Curated annotation (Swiss-Prot):
Organism: Bacillus velezensis (strain DSM 23117 / BGSC 10A6 / LMG 26770 / FZB42) (Bacillus amyloliquefaciens subsp. plantarum)
PANTHER family: GTPASE DER (PTHR43834:SF6)
Gene coding for it: der
Chain residues that bind GTP 1: 10-17, 57-61, 119-122
A Gene Ontology BP annotation from the UniProt entry: ribosome biogenesis
N-terminal signal peptide: none
Protein name per its UniProtKB record: GTPase Der
Family: Belongs to the TRAFAC class TrmE-Era-EngA-EngB-Septin-like GTPase superfamily. EngA (Der) GTPase family.
Keywords from the named record: GTP-binding, Nucleotide-binding, Repeat, Ribosome biogenesis
Record domain EngA-type G: where: 4-167, 176-351
Subunit structure: Associates with the 50S ribosomal subunit.
GO MF entries: GTP binding; ribosome binding
Keyword Nucleotide-binding: yes
Length: 436
């Protein structure tokens, strides 16, 4: 199951970003007193009562030059589409406004649970105002103060109560789940159609975790796969086409549920900043990654073009140096046959376990080749290493002092591990721990 998604909805200047930052535990959004100022990150992981969940600040979803109320409506619609639980936030100092009532009218239509949060109630006297908000029709209002962090525990308890009722879409561990992500119009749907048109592919559609998400299950060479949220790739409409951050939000949810992520680039347009941002989310989530250059048929080529394009990708995506780069055309289906083998290989490497004795031979050979660094007269000593997890493969190296493990030496060890075991298509993580 993907993590539950909680969306914070409300008119501008009710304190959505402050609460978002409080819950996320870090200052992610830009917080000012000017309406509509949220510009930065709108999506963050958070944790409460042993629940991991994703948090959205819909104020960060910029609809463009639409009228004020239209923007609020569209942000609320997106929250209703994407969230499992909605926090409807109002300003306790200003009472119920017509804009609050507009948001309430939209939220009446949703079957998703709505938790009403009355912000900016910084002391007990102010809480006398809370009863006015029962008129909005969402039951008990939760008094909170974003500035002082008051009342957030009760608010999150109320959200967590609803997490228990979220339906799970659980595939067996043998099923490889993957998604294709990328900017609008890079050809994600066309790639899916071209893949599913291959002779060896047997297709069926299954319901995803949200009411409008459809996953596509298929079998390839007797292995079962699921393409996560094929409905999201095909979603049209003004909000979805024009809102860059909406497409990122949808991609993040798909990444969360996937083992392997295909980052799709448009060969005609080259590499844009948004491509790097979207790819960065897959890397940060520790997923296996394959880079797919689509629309290769539309590019004028000579014998150097592909190599130069790949070099350009490597320069822009240095954090994805482990990801294979595939060139293909969904339109002509040329090289489409290379995609499934690459996904299978990345998935296998993402789950690969290596023997401890072989791993330690590799580590000790690496140390002999390149002695450990020193700092202030102390030298790093490596005692032994062991693999502690897969998806992604994660290793703990036991040392005398973790502070002496410089990132460049950690990178050197990673490269030696990759030389020995491959791991193409997957990130690997290395943690230094003091031997007890």
């Amino acid at each position: 199951m993907g993590k539950p998604v909680v969306a914070i909805v409300g008119r501008p200047n009710v304190g959505k970003s402050t609460i978002f930052n409080r819950i996320a535990g870090e200052r992610i959004s830009i917080v000012e007193d000017t309406p509509g100022v949220t510009r930065d990150r709108i999506y963050s992981s958070a944790e409460w009562l042993n629940y991991d969940f994703n948090l959205i600040d819909t104020g960060g979803i910029d609809i463009g030059d639409e009228p004020f109320l239209t923007q609020i409506r569209q942000q609320a619609e997106i929250a209703m589409d994407e969230a499992d639980v909605i926090i409807f936030m109002v300003n306790g100092r200003e009472g119920v406004t017509s804009a609050d009532e507009e948001v309430a009218k939209i939220l009446y239509r949703t079957k998703k649970p709505v938790v009403l949060a009355v912000n900016k109630l910084d002391n007990t006297e102010m809480r006398a105002n809370i009863y006015d908000f029962y008129a909005l029709g969402f039951g008990e209002p939760y008094p909170i103060s974003g500035t002082h962090g008051l009342g957030l525990g009760d608010l999150l308890d109320a959200c967590a109560e609803h997490f228990k009722n979220i339906p799970e879409t659980k595939y067996s561990d043998d099923v490889v789940q993957f998604c294709l992500i990328g900017r609008p119009n890079v050809g994600k749907s066309s790639l899916v159609n071209a893949m599913l048109g291959e002779e060896r592919v047997i297709v069926s559609n299954v319901a995803g975790t949200t009411r409008d998400a459809v996953d596509t299950a298929f079998t390839y060479n007797q292995q079962e796969f699921v393409i996560v949220d094929t409905a999201g790739m095909r979603k049209k409409g003004k909000v979805y086409e024009t809102t860059e951050k909406y497409s990122v939000l949808r991609a993040l949810k798909a990444i969360d549920r996937s083992d392997v992520v295909g980052v799709v680039l448009n060969a005609e347009e080259g590499i844009l900043e948004q491509d790097k941002r979207i790819a960065g989310y897959a890397h940060e989530a520790g997923k296996a990654v394959v880079i797919i250059v689509n629309k290769w048929d539309a590019v004028d080529k000579d014998e150097r073009t592909m190599k130069e394009f790949e070099q350009n990708i490597r320069e822009h995506f240095q954090f994805l140096d482990y990801a294979p780069v595939l060139f293909m055309s969904a339109l002509t289906t040329k090289r489409i046959h290379t995609l499934m083998p690459a996904i299978i290989k990345a998935s296998e490497n993402h789950s690969l376990r290596v023997q401890t004795n072989v791993l330690n031979d590799v580590i000790m050979d690496a140390v002999a080749m390149n002695p450990t660094p020193t700092h202030n007269g102390s030298r790093l000593k490596i005692y032994y290493a062991t693999q502690v997890a897969v998806k992604p493969p994660s290793f703990v190296v036991f040392v005398n002092d973790p502070e002496l493990m410089h990132f460049s030496y950690e990178r050197f060890l990673e490269n030696r591990i990759r030389d020995a075991f491959g791991f193409e298509g997957t990130p690997i993580k290395i943690f230094a721990r003091a031997r007890k």
